[in-house]
């Protein structure tokens, strides 16, 4: 009887995951219709809905198990036996890897993230890495330019399943061919093979054709973002073939793609060729499997810990007033713990901070806010913690620590991509880097604002610089919606002595913001202030922010491009007469 109950529980968990992933695919499949109808508010709503599906279905399964098993549901040894049976259900299961993560989530919900040991949950996968020699549904279709690139691209684009007309397909094909001829030699293009993913990748206002361009000297990404104009006609906005550009398109600071992937492991394996710099966790994250990516991030962390002898240290940069941040010297992640007590000037609660981090996960991050993974009861061997960090932990977050002798448990933390703090980057930057990064910094603020996000604290220390030179915001405790802020001009002084007074001569409400004050606390360096005013002086005007607010209230959703504006075909000269692409510097207001 007990054996039958264990089998029933294992099957219930797997069926619960089937239901979750079925709904995940259902929401994803609606991306084509939302794109064709230009229903951008529905795009944003579907993104949030899909993120919530996972936790919702975990909750449903947990309630089912409590009804089925009674008190045995709280028996860790019982669930360890269930895990053994569950493992035997997976060898022929197409989404085994995410099913394992779903089991982990159910277990953690039942046991409040306690007793997290390999015998009770899938710390590592139970299945071999290369599961499927043959897949039931091909990931991609192959094209060969036997009759020339023009004809091949015409066939490729004519097969796109979108039910909208093309604005000018011959023109777009001409743009693509001209770009390829500038980028690669005629000999390379003659020997090329192109593989294109069968499914479109939807995000924001674009549907992406994603492909692999195989040339004699290697494999290159081949990315074509499809947009449509105000009349509902399709056009290709650019062609991207560099790994750096592809990495940004699939970057950690962007919303997840909606791509129909009934076999996600096969899609991830296929993408790895064009995104060799991305880890397994990052690829699962890019296609929207954020909970499984969390599992993979943790596995990457465990692998790094096992292969290194580094100690955890306090992260470089200015210490935060809300978060304690630490890292490993050569690891590409940081760990952030909410402090038990905040500095007096920080009028927020821990609950508010956590809500801000959840808002960022669900919101369109427009390439300017880093995604995070949330962990509970994170265990670290004490000998791997530097004495300075250990002292800092006990000083700042004692309520979130549990001492297990040779190990330390941190009850709650966030893991986030490590970047160079902007304030540290500025100290080392040469003249060109300084110009570029200040332009990027202003662009980041503008793009966040256009996406209805006001960063709140815009000091340099709250932004990071990625390896691609992009500026990304990562301090979320003061963010709010743009529509919640009251942008004001500073009233003229009533008397000359008002300007010398310690207190302002005008009233200030909690949500009041005075953009005229930004230069004083953002740019103490005169040279940096001059650069910023030249490129982004409009940020110091209340009218600029009010105009953005009005567009947001009217329901306007801005176009977001995962590449520089100068790369857009519409921004270039006629490609038939262009011999080289302008590739210098950052553009003004890239989106």
From Swiss-Prot:
UniProt-listed Enzyme Commission number(s): 2.7.11.5, 3.1.3.-
Catalytic activity as recorded in UniProt: L-seryl-[isocitrate dehydrogenase] + ATP = O-phospho-L-seryl-[isocitrate dehydrogenase] + ADP + H(+)
Residues reported to bind ATP: 315-321, 336
Subcellular location per the Swiss-Prot or TrEMBL entry: Cytoplasm
Pfam assignment, any one: AceK_regulatory
Residues at the active site: 371
Record-linked InterPro entries: AceK_kinase, AceK_regulatory, Isocitrate_DH_AceK
Claim: ATP-binding is one of the keywords in the record: yes
GO molecular function, one term: phosphoprotein phosphatase activity
Similarity remark: Belongs to the AceK family.
Task performed by this protein: Bifunctional enzyme which can phosphorylate or dephosphorylate isocitrate dehydrogenase (IDH) on a specific serine residue. This is a regulatory mechanism which enables bacteria to bypass the Krebs cycle via the glyoxylate shunt in response to the source of carbon. When bacteria are grown on glucose, IDH is fully active and unphosphorylated, but when grown on acetate or ethanol, the activity of IDH declines drastically concomitant with its phosphorylation.
Name of this protein: Isocitrate dehydrogenase kinase/phosphatase
Species whose genome carries this gene: Pectobacterium carotovorum subsp. carotovorum (strain PC1)
Gene of this entry: aceK
